[in-house]
Structure formats: structure tokens, C-alpha cells
Amino acid sequence: MKRWTISQVPHLVHGRTNGETDPLTLFWTASGLEVNVRGGELWVELSADWSMYEPWYSFVVNGEFLSRRMAEKGTHRVCVFRGMNPETVKNVRIVKDTQAMSGDPESLLQICALETDGSFEPVEPRALKLEFIGDSITSGEGSIGAKAEEDWVSMFFCAENNYAVMTAQAVGADVRILSQSG
């Protein structure tokens, strides 16, 4: 297993960021990192903090939603996949599910590094780019969870079930989202 910083590997950054990749700070819904990995396993090192609203994130492998997690405070290694065919290339997206939490100035989610037993391949940028500006629906609020849920909590935000992300996928575009519940 070898550890790589984001700037050391071919990648695409999704969403508006501060322009830095070491670490890559994720602010907005559906912001994230996309890489192509030829290897049997991939781990991501994430750093997170918050006082009220914990960030949530998802892994998408080969275009399919794979898993979703709450970010733990501090810096942690998380397995994206393991035990897969080391000869095939896997397209991986690490995606922030929650919106920018203006009510929690400590809210933070950063991708610090990647670890794999393989190598990274170039990621082809999409020809189209869409940007959505909106409110709670655009932030993915309520796009996951039981229909009866009415609590306003981070775990009910989801980028994968979001109309902006679905629209971009339908037309083969990259997506940027600037939105805030209100």
C-alpha cells in the first residue's frame, strides 16, 4: 500500500473549492474528488470537524452508489473498496452529501490522502458542466430517509438522490451546487 496526496494523482475536483488539493476541502453539496484506480483496494484519509452539524459523505464506484457515512471528528482512514480485481480500473467518486453549514463555523470535511495497492489512471473530464444555485431541495435535504421524517439533521441530506446530480448524470455533465436550506 502506498499513500498519495491528492496533487500526486490524476484526479477531477467536483464543486467549488478554495483551489487547494492538499488537503481538498469540500464545502458544498456534491463537491468531491474523482479518481480512476487500478488496484485491489483503496483507502481515503479524511479530516472532519463540527460542533453541531456533522458532515456526511458517500462513495460512488463505477457510477453506482456504494456506501454512505457520517464523518468522524479528527483524521481517519476509511476503506472505499478492497478485495477487488487488481487489474481492472475502478472509477471512484468521494462525494460530500451535506450542504455548507453556515450555522456551524467549525463544520469541516477534507480529503487528505489516498492509499492503494495499485496505481492511478487519468480521469477524462466531461464536456458539459452544470451549476445549480438553490435552496433546500438543491442541497439534497430530505432526499434520503423515511417520508415521515421531519427532523432537520445532517443525515437527511444526500447528494446521490439530489435532482441536480441526477440531471447532470442524465446529460453526462459535471455538476456544481451552491445551495443553502432556508
Spans of model-derived segments:
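A short beta-strand-loop structural module common to alpha/beta enzyme folds
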Residues: 173-182
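Short catalytic helix/loop segments, enriched in acidic residues and glycine
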Residues: 154-165
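N-terminal secretory targeting modules
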Residues: 1-133, 137-156
